[in-house]
């Protein structure tokens, strides 16, 4: 389950107050995910209920978060289907909750799937292309925290969940990527923000 940090109703109610989005109706942990604690949150504002997603960041630091949250804000402002972070009354996109940085974002329609179809893949490809185009004028930058070094570090953890023949394919591909990362072509590739953990 992807709830590593537990929170109380009282903690969340206090944390939500500076966002001025309404009264807490309910919240529940989200079972999927591998890195952060995530919760569905329902708020009521003048009789109108709205669903959100709360993320408590377990790994990313307060210094790393602005890049990601500002990128999400940038892409959402261009009408891409990405979660939109909500700022508190002082403009902060994240604040501490249970001793860790946390952010509230819009809840997107849809659900995850463990059996993607070619249609799903085509939809993802379209949105990724739109994201890359929309991100060209995003000015912030930061090192790729989900680049090749991270992939190499995660390989053994991921391989533990894979059949042997698939784990072998993963290892082989990472070797190809390591070799490619040493080439002039790789170093000449354009740089920009992207969903590198995808």
Each language-model region and where it sits:
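ATP-binding pocket architecture of kinase catalytic cores
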Residues: 44-140
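Short secondary-structure capping/turn segments at boundaries of alpha-helices and beta-strands
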Residues: 25-28, 37-40, 72
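Active-site acidic catalytic loop and adjacent metal/ATP-binding pocket
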Residues: 31-54, 85-86, 178-198
């Amino acid at each position: 389950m992807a709830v590593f940090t537990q929170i109380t109703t009282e903690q969340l109610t206090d944390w939500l107050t500076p966002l001025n989005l309404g009264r807490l109706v309910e919240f529940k942990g989200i079972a999927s995910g591998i890195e952060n604690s995530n919760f569905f949150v329902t708020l009521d504002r003048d009789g109108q209920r709205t669903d959100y997603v709360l993320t408590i960041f377990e790994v990313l630091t307060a210094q790393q978060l602005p890049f990601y949250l500002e990128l999400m804000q940038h892409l959402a402002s261009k009408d891409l289907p990405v979660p939109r972070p909500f700022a508190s009354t002082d403009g902060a996109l994240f604040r501490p909750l249970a001793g860790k940085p946390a952010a509230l974002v819009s809840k997107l329609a849809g659900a995850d799937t463990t059996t993607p179809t070619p249609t799903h893949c085509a939809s993802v490809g379209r949105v990724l292309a739109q994201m890359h185009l929309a991100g060209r004028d995003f000015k912030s930058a930061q090192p790729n925290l989900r680049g090749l070094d991270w992939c190499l570090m995660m390989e053994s953890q991921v391989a533990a969940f894979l059949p042997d023949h698939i784990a072998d394919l993963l290892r082989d591909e990472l070797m190809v990527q390591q070799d490619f990362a040493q080439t002039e072509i790789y170093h000449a590739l354009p740089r920009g923000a992207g969903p590198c953990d995808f």
